[in-house]
């Protein structure tokens, strides 16, 4: 496995182009299953998860062409004929988002066999909401030997579906399924994340009829067929937030290009409260620090527009050297504090109390050998390594490649001393 090395203590200064959002790109790829015409996606990030989902689409009968650009790719997907409605364990176990093929396959083919999902090991993350929603739309579903077997012989029917909790995955799945269902589907308590809106806008470009985009109530009037379209993937607010934290922790000044501040305003608000400077302009955000020590700031993860759980680990790293004690509360996923013991190897002082972590700020961190436990924890360890004195070695960085594109190159361009040692 590859290893990342960092010599810390350097300020970041420069400009970082923010890649297309992983959490929009993946469901957009699955939306290509809803039509037999080409779906052209621009601003596609180059990520391991994208490559894995590409394999699954090919397994189902899709043709995927990629045009390499300087900073992003253009992906054209055409699924003229679905050759298989089975998403095998070997692929789905690698990436949770591959489970999202369930809705499009069921809507277009009236049947699907999809393995229960994999991805980062952060709690149970059950798929009950997906299944119950599809059942309300008339699907017959059984769980057999680790697979979801779904059938809708007469096609899916519109329904009013109220989710007991906000679920991004369930909203994606049910919205895509409803686009080809008979009648009107209303999704109440739907997720409002920008990535949901991005997928909805793409579906509209493909001919879907969706009202309430950006709100917690989506009204989808099913149509007989969808057509091809060209759609630009929105910027990755989690990547932007990660680099914003890195800039604040190391000092200096970084301009994040191609991202709108409102998509990650909750994170920027916490940065301001901690003492970092934040200035936004059209299509860019500038992060800077005047050299004074950051102040401890409490964080509670929430669904959008609240503070995102996918930035919790990065902000914990930031708080390890802030002045005072901060309380970080994780309300979205269980078991998402696996990075705590690795941050402690840098000299961080963190104690766990159920769903809360108390971070007692220390004067400085010291470089250490550490191991990544999941995607976002990997980013937190890189941030800590950038600020720490001495050299840091991060193992198991395959997690990182699932969600961050060219992270070493982007940080190096801003003055970081960071490099990758390829596995022998």
Swiss-Prot record:
Please name the pathway. Answer: Cell wall biogenesis; peptidoglycan biosynthesis
Positions with a binding annotation for UDP-N-acetyl-alpha-D-glucosamine: 96, 125-129, 310, 332
SUPFAM superfamilies, per the entry:
EPT/RTPC-like
Q: Does the keyword Transcription apply?
A: no
Location in the cell: Cytoplasm
Q: Which residues form the active site?
A: 120 (proton donor)
Q: InterPro entries from the entry?
A: Enolpyruvate_Tfrase_dom, Enolpyruvate_Tfrase_sf, MurA_subfamily, RNA3'P_cycl/enolpyr_Trfase_a/b, UDP_GlcNAc_COvinyl_MurA
Kindly indicate whether the keyword ATP-binding belongs to this entry.
no
Q: Name one GO cellular component term.
A: cytoplasm
- Sites where 2-(S-cysteinyl)pyruvic acid O-phosphothioketal occurs are at 120
Which EC numbers does the record give? Answer: 2.5.1.7
Positions binding phosphoenolpyruvate in this chain are 22-23
Q: What is its main location?
A: cytoplasm
Task: Quote the catalytic activity from the record.
Answer: phosphoenolpyruvate + UDP-N-acetyl-alpha-D-glucosamine = UDP-N-acetyl-3-O-(1-carboxyvinyl)-alpha-D-glucosamine + phosphate
Its EC top class is: transferase
Q: Name one GO molecular function term.
A: UDP-N-acetylglucosamine 1-carboxyvinyltransferase activity
Protein family membership: Belongs to the EPSP synthase family. MurA subfamily.
PANTHER family this protein is in? UDP-N-ACETYLGLUCOSAMINE 1-CARBOXYVINYLTRANSFERASE (PTHR43783:SF1)
Protein name (record): UDP-N-acetylglucosamine 1-carboxyvinyltransferase
Q: What gene codes for this chain?
A: murA
């Amino acid at each position: 496995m590859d290893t990342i090395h960092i010599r810390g203590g350097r300020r970041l200064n420069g400009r970082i182009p923010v890649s297309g959002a992983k959490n929009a790109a993946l469901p957009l790829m699955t939306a290509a299953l809803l039509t037999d015409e080409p779906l052209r996606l621009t601003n596609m990030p180059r990520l391991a998860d994208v490559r894995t989902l590409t394999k699954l689409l090919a397994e189902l009968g899709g043709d995927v062409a990629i045009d390499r650009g300087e900073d992003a790719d253009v992906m054209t997907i055409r699924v003229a004929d679905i050759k298989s409605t089975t998403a095998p364990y070997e692929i789905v176990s690698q990436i949770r988002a591959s489970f999202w093929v369930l809705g499009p396959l069921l809507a277009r083919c009236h049947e699907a066999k999809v393995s229960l999902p994999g991805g980062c090991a952060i709690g149970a993350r059950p798929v009950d909401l997906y299944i119950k929603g599809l059942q309300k739309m008339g699907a017959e579903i059984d769980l057999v030997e680790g697979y979801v077997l779904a059938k809708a012989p007469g096609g899916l029917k519109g329904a009013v579906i109220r989710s007991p909790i906000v679920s991004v995955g369930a909203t994606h799945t049910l919205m895509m399924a409803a686009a080809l269902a008979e009648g009107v589907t209303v999704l109440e308590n739907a997720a409002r994340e920008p990535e949901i809106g991005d997928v909805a806008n793409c579906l509209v470009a493909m001919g879907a009829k969706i009202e309430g985009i950006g709100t917690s109530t989506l009204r989808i009037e099913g149509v007989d067929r969808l057509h091809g379209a060209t759609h630009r993937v929105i910027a990755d607010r989690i990547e932007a937030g990660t680099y914003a934290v890195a800039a604040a922790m190391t000092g200096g000044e970084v301009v994040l290009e191609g991202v709108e501040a409102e998509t990650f305003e909750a994170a920027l608000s916490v940065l301001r409260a901690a003492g970092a400077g934040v200035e936004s302009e059209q299509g860019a955000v500038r992060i800077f620090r005047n050299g004074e020590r950051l102040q401890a700031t409490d964080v509670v993860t929430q669904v959008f527009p609240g503070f995102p759980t996918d930035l919790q680990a990065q902000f914990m790293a930031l708080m390890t050297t802030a002045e005072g004690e901060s309380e970080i509360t994780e309300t979205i996923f269980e078991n998402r504090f696996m990075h705590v013991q690795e941050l402690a190897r840098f000299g961080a002082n963190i104690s766990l109390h159920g769903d809360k972590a108390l971070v007692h700020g220390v004067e400085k961190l010291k470089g250490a050998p550490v191991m990544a436990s999941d995607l976002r924890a990997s980013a937190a360890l890189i941030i800590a390594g950038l600020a720490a004195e001495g050299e840091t070695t991060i193992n198991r960085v395959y997690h990182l490649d699932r969600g961050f594109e060219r992270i070493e190159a982007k940080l190096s361009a801003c003055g970081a001393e960071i490099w990758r040692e390829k596995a022998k």
